[in-house]
Structure formats: structure tokens, C-alpha cells
Curated annotation (Swiss-Prot):
Belongs to the CcmF/CycK/Ccl1/NrfE/CcsA family. The chain crosses the membrane at residues 17-37, 48-68, 71-91, 98-118, 143-163, 225-245, 259-273, 286-306. It holds the Pfam family Cytochrom_C_asm. It comes from Populus alba (White poplar). This is Cytochrome c biogenesis protein CcsA. Required during biogenesis of c-type cytochromes (cytochrome c6 and cytochrome f) at the step of heme attachment. HAMAP family: CytC_CcsA. The keyword Membrane applies. GO terms for biological process: cytochrome complex assembly.
Length: 321
């Protein structure tokens, strides 16, 4: 009873604090002068991390296993990983470009786990025989950690695309006005002028310097986080294959979860291929990573709606009986 009460308290404290952090982020976006509020938001995320850590430890103690065996527990674990990713640039004294992604991710993930799922799903249950293995911690923790890192990296790539295409639209609009006012509608002149404007835009002039730096940082951090996430995902898939062979006598069974995990791995393998190809890097790799964001959610969450396959123990019902 004490553990359940403590878990309840930690859950509400962590969600309340991260909600305040989100409000602070909105305020700092509107008013840049609130530097003190930004520092408070970082301390708030640190508080959220400790509350989620205490929540996971408490649940581990009274359940007897690492709390990653069902959808509710994995969502809390996912929120915890988001909070860790959030604090890495903070402790390294880098400008935290991740904060606008990791803080809302923590908020929405924990919010859905706490308020979006049925109350019965919050209760800790005895592990089914298939999960009573030493491979549980390795496989599930690596997969969820990989999902968290890949989601953050994908959102950074999506942000890069938004900033870049907004700039392209502005340039093209400027170019069209220039053509209408100064030149006849001639295709050759249009292409020459368009090429010239694009070339000048990517120079870090005084007007575009901040945006240029932001794009470079988004690309840099996105690549680093996606690299870590891809490594975790690979380890998770390999450890899962070994576990499957021990439990079911086959390394791979092509059930929905395994199939979408393979699709996810393939998408991000394509991303890293485009990064090594000078003709495809930049926007092309960012587009691939952005597609990967949707694929991850289908793999992690969407497949659970089916409730079929060897991973059906992680599924849930939408309507309570």
C-alpha cells in the first residue's frame, strides 16, 4: 500500500512539474528576455527526471521486475528516456536545441500514460511466461531507448525541413516578384535568377546567419541522436532475436511487431546511407528521417491496436468491458 501511494504521488508530481515546464517554454518563445524562466524549466526537467526515476524504482520493488512489461510501463519508461535526452546538452553546457522537442515529448507521453489509458492498465501484473527471461531488460530497454532517441532525431529533422522550406518559399516568392517587375517571362532568365538567389541565401549573411547556424545545429544534433537511436534499435532487435529463439525456437517469425521493427530499421538505414552520399545528404536525409517518425509510432503504438501476433501481450483494448 505504501508503494502504491508513493507511486501515485510521484506520478502526479512529475506530470505537474513537466506541465509547468511546458508553460515556461511557451513564455520563453513569446518573450526572449525571460532567461531566468529558461533556467527554471531546466531545473523542472531535472525534477521530472528524479520523480520518474523514483516512480520506476518504486514500481520495480513491489512488482519484482523492471517496469517495461506492458504499454503503461513502457510509456513511463519512454518519458524517462526523453527526460535523460533533454538533460544531456544541459550538463554539457551546450545550447539546448532539444528542449523544445524533449519537454513536450515527455509531457504528452506521460500524459497519455497517466490519463489516456484505462485505470486497470496502471496496475502491475504478474509476468506472462514468455516474459520471464533475463532477456527482458536487455531487449525492451534497448528498443524503447532506441524509439526515444529516433523520435527526437526525427523531430529535429522535421524542424530542419520546416525552417528550410519556409526560406525556400520566401525566396521563390521574392524571385517571382522580381521577374514580374523587371523581366519578361522568360524561362532561361527565371532559372538563372532562381539559381543566383538560392546561392546567395545559403551564405551566412548578417540577415540569415542565425537561421544558417540553427539549420547546421539541427542537422548536427539530429544526426548524433539518430546514430545513438539506431545503435540501440539494432541491439534491441538482435537481443530480441536471440530471446525469440530461446522462447519460441525461431529467431524471426514475421509477426506485426517484428515486421514493423524491421521496416523502422530499414528506414533509418536508408537515412544513414543518404548521409554518406554527397548527392543525397541534407534535405533528402531529413525527409527520410521525418518519414521514420511516423514509422516508429506505427511500430511502437499502432501495432498494439491489432492485438495479434507473438507480441500481443503488450496490446490494449479501447473499450472497457
Amino acid at each position: 500500500m505504501i508503494f502504491l501511494t508513493l507511486e501515485h504521488i510521484l506520478t502526479h508530481i512529475s506530470f505537474s512539474v513537466v506541465s509547468i515546464v511546458i508553460i515556461i517554454h511557451f513564455l520563453t518563445l513569446l518573450v526572449n528576455e525571460f532567461v531566468g524562466l529558461y533556467d527554471s524549466s531546466e531545473k523542472g526537467m531535472l525534477t521530472t527526471f528524479f520523480c520518474l526515476t523514483g516512480l520506476l524504482i518504486t514500481r520495480w520493488i513491489y512488482s519484482g521486475h523492471l517496469p517495461i512489461s506492458d504499454l503503461y510501463e513502457s510509456l513511463i519508461f519512454l518519458s524517462w528516456i526523453f527526460s535523460i535526452i533533454h538533460m544531456v546538452p544541459y550538463f554539457k553546457k551546450h545550447k539546448n536545441y532539444l528542449s523544445t522537442i524533449t519537454a513536450p515529448s515527455t509531457f504528452f507521453t506521460q500524459g497519455f500514460a497517466t490519463w489516456g489509458l484505462l485505470t486497470d492498465m496502471h496496475q502491475s501484473k504478474i509476468l506472462v511466461p514468455a516474459l520471464q527471461s533475463q532477456w527482458l531488460i536487455m531487449h525492451v530497454s534497448m528498443m524503447v531507448s532506441g524509439y526515444a532517441a529516433l523520435l527526437c532525431g526525427s523531430l529535429l529533422s522535421a524542424a530542419l525541413l520546416v525552417i528550410t522550406f519556409r526560406k525556400v518559399i520566401r525566396i521563390v516568392g521574392k524571385n517571382n516578384n522580381l521577374l514580374n517587375d523587371s523581366f519578361p517571362v522568360d524561362e532561361i532568365q527565371y532559372m538563372m535568377e532562381k539559381k543566383s538567389i538560392f546561392k546567395n541565401t545559403f551564405f551566412p549573411s548578417s540577415r540569415n546567419y542565425y537561421r544558417f547556424q540553427l539549420i547546421q545545429q539541427l542537422d548536427h544534433w539530429g544526426f548524433r541522436i539518430l546514430s545513438i537511436g539506431f545503435l540501440f534499435l539494432t541491439i534491441g532487435i538482435l537481443s530480441g532475436a536471440v530471446w525469440a529463439n530461446e522462447a519460441w525456437g525461431s529467431y524471426w517469425n514475421w509477426d506485426p511487431k517484428e515486421t514493423w521493427a524491421f521496416i523502422t530499421w530499414t528506414i533509418f538505414a536508408i537515412y544513414f546511407h543518404t548521409r554518406t552520399n554527397k548527392n543525397l545528404e541534407g534535405l533528402n536525409s531529413a525527409i527520410v528521417a521525418s518519414i521514420g517518425f511516423l514509422i516508429i509510432w506505427i511500430c511502437y503504438f499502432g501495432v498494439n491496436l491489432l492485438g495479434i501476433g507473438l507480441h500481443s501481450y503488450g496490446s490494449f483494448t479501447l473499450i472497457s468491458n
